[in-house]
């Protein structure tokens, strides 16, 4: 009987759902998933080393378009102690601590009066033996909806080349309704 009780106890413990992973920082990944869930039509401007191309897009895959914004999610176990919190009322701001070597250098979200993101800005950079890369990502929102975003940056071979510079700018035209 005792064995049965112990077995039943372990079975109940094993069936309880595991807790959500701890979030030490603003849950940007969750916010980005929410923003990506609504279809969006954008006018996109791409500038590559001074050459400009304008693309009117009927509807874009926001998950792919904003893949670089996913890099700014700080809620990874290895990042937990690597950032200094410089937040203030209405501003969420994290800066990489001195001596740390992680790609996200700065993470800032300005909130509107309802506590929703209004301006989002991230600085990401990395270097290895071959490349040096830097990116600045920004997004503007009104009432929780994206009105524009910009991804700009450069990449270069460390020793032998001038950097390739790029900018991708998207301006929301209107929300696309799904049928």
Predicted regions and their residues:
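Gly/Pro-enriched, hydrophobic low-complexity segments
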Residues: 92-179
């Amino acid at each position: 009987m005792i064995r049965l009780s112990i077995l039943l106890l372990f079975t109940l413990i094993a069936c309880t759902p595991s807790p959500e992973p701890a979030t030490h920082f603003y849950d940007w990944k969750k916010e980005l998933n929410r923003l990506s869930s609504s279809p969006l039509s954008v006018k996109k401007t791409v500038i590559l080393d001074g050459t400009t191309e304008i693309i009117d897009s009927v509807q874009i895959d926001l998950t792919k378009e904003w893949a670089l914004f996913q890099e700014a999610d700080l809620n990874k176990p290895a990042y937990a102690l690597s950032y200094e919190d410089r937040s203030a009322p209405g501003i969420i701001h994290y800066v990489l601590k001195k001596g740390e070597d992680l790609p996200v250098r700065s993470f800032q979200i300005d909130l509107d009066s309802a506590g929703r993101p209004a301006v989002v800005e991230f600085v990401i950079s990395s270097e290895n033996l071959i490349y040096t890369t830097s990116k600045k990502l920004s997004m503007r929102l009104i009432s929780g909806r994206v009105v524009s975003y910009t991804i700009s940056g450069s990449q270069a071979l460390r020793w032998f080349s001038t950097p390739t510079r790029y900018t991708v700018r998207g301006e929301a035209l209107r929300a696309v309704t799904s049928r």
